[in-house]
Regions:
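A general secondary-structure boundary signal
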Residues: 63, 340-341, 397, 404, ...
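Extended, compositionally biased low-complexity polar/Lys-Gly-rich tracts
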Residues: 247, 251, 397-408
Length: 430
């Protein structure tokens, strides 16, 4: 079909109250511009979609609304592998949206729903090269209605959960749909077969009817109280021992694109456990970070170097050879300063546990977008131990470094250059 032009979709504000029920009874949906020219992405990327899909968008002061009518050409049952939240998109019938609110081709958000109404949301980092990070969770709303020849999904995504720069007149966006009953996948903006469907450089444009306004600052506080009791019956009946804990997290939107995360005595008991893997190699396994405090903008800290050589790996904080080290507290500021600059600052303090002394971790990262789709970044890290007298001046590790990530706009060419230097007490004072 040759080179495909970037598709555009206009979005208009509504004063109508929209009920999320999957029925699209509100008249506003009849007046929306429709995105309905979809292309195949699976099994080939050279054809138009066989099954029709209509997508409409609108918004009010609080929510971005998206509705999709997914028509069926096959009356067989839907293919759905799991009813678990954050299901695997490639192996399920589903509709998904990918949003790049900064128009920087680098960071964004994804929301998906399958015909059974199961939700999936995640962060898109590094331009979508690695798909969607589903450890990120927010509250949003969706409903599905199934008919004989189609199924309809209706979404309401709160602006308070999205990071964006006010005043922008367009976002980048893409819609995709899996119709696995006929073994096909579609996208509104064509994505070449050899790229991930979440790749942001291939998104279309969402044109706002007026520059999007600044939203109210969002503040979320999540406290917890825990308690436990244990009693030994052997070798003798002893009195029970009680323990208690309290703490919490806070998420404060400094601006619409800059967020402050705070944590005190964090409790990660609700975090999904890692899958069990038998490691027969001589190298350590790298499991993804699932603790919410570290998730958003995690690529700003963790994407330096490459997979086997990372100067910063957040999973090491709070763990020592598999043993849990209690985290006293931490603060984390991360996000966008403007379209081209990103900043990240983090400080975490862990308590003494066994032979492991108190530790303080500080990370600072700065990233600049260059050459339209490339980035140059700088990072500085410091780990310092504490003893009974305070900072242990002879037990520290420090790293400074820079990375240059090169990507052409069409993603045909990519490369990476980095230099990191580590400093230890023995090396400086020998």
């Amino acid at each position: 079909m040759g080179q495909k032009a970037t598709p555009k979709l206009n979005i208009y504000q509504t004063e109508t109250k929209i009920k999320i029920d999957g029925e699209l009874n509100e008249t506003v949906w009849q007046n929306c511009d429709v995105a309905n020219q979809f292309y195949q992405s699976v099994p080939v990327d050279t054809s138009y979609a066989k099954s029709k899909t209509d997508v409409m968008t609108t918004y009010d002061n609080k929510y971005l609304y998206i509705a999709a009518v997914c028509y069926d050409t096959n009356s067989q049952p839907f293919i759905i592998q799991s009813l678990k939240r954050d299901f695997s998109y490639p192996i399920s019938d589903a509709f998904a949206v990918y949003i790049d609110p900064y128009d920087d081709h680098t960071n964004g958000f994804s929301f998906a729903v399958n015909p059974k109404g199961v939700q999936r949301e995640g962060l898109i980092q590094v331009g979508g090269n690695y798909g969607v990070t589903t450890a990120w969770d927010i509250l949003w709303f969706s409903e599905v209605k199934i008919y004989n020849d189609r199924w309809i999904v209706e979404m309401a995504i709160p602006f308070s959960s999205l990071r964006f720069n006010p005043g922008m007149e367009k976002w980048r966006i893409n819609f995709s749909r899996n119709d696995l009953k006929i073994n096909e996948g579609y996208s509104w903006a064509a994505v070449p077969r050899n790229f991930n469907i979440a790749s942001l450089p291939f998104c279309g444009e969402l044109i706002w009817d007026k520059p999007i306004r600044k939203r109210k600052k969002s503040v979320a506080i999540i406290p917890y109280i825990s308690g436990s009791s244990q009693k030994k019956y052997q070798p003798k009946n002893e009195s029970p021992e009680f323990s208690q804990g309290f703490g919490g997290d806070a998420r404060i939107g400094i601006t619409n694109s800059l967020q402050l995360d705070l944590t005190i005595n964090p409790d990660f008991s609700q975090v999904e456990v890692d899958r069990q893997v038998t490691n027969l190699s001589r190298f350590s396994l790298y499991f993804p970070e699932r603790r919410n405090f570290f998730i958003e903008n995690s690529d700003l800290f963790s994407d330096f170097g490459f997979r086997q050589i990372r100067p910063f790996f957040s999973r090491k904080i709070g763990l020592n050879n598999g043993n849990i080290i209690p985290i006293v507290g931490g603060a984390r500021l991360s996000g966008k300063l403007n379209k081209d600059w990103r900043i990240g600052l983090m400080n975490i303090h862990t308590n003494k546990s066994g032979n492991t002394p108190q530790q303080n971790y500080t990370v600072a990262a700065l990233q600049r977008r260059v050459l339209k789709n490339s980035t140059i970044g700088f990072i500085g890290l410091n780990r310092n131990s504490f003893d009974s007298s305070g900072i242990n001046q002879s037990d520290y590790n420090r790293i400074i470094g820079t990375d240059f990530n090169f990507n052409t706009l069409d993603r045909k060419w990519a490369g990476k250059f980095f230099y990191h230097q580590s400093f230890k007490y023995r090396e400086i004072h020998q």
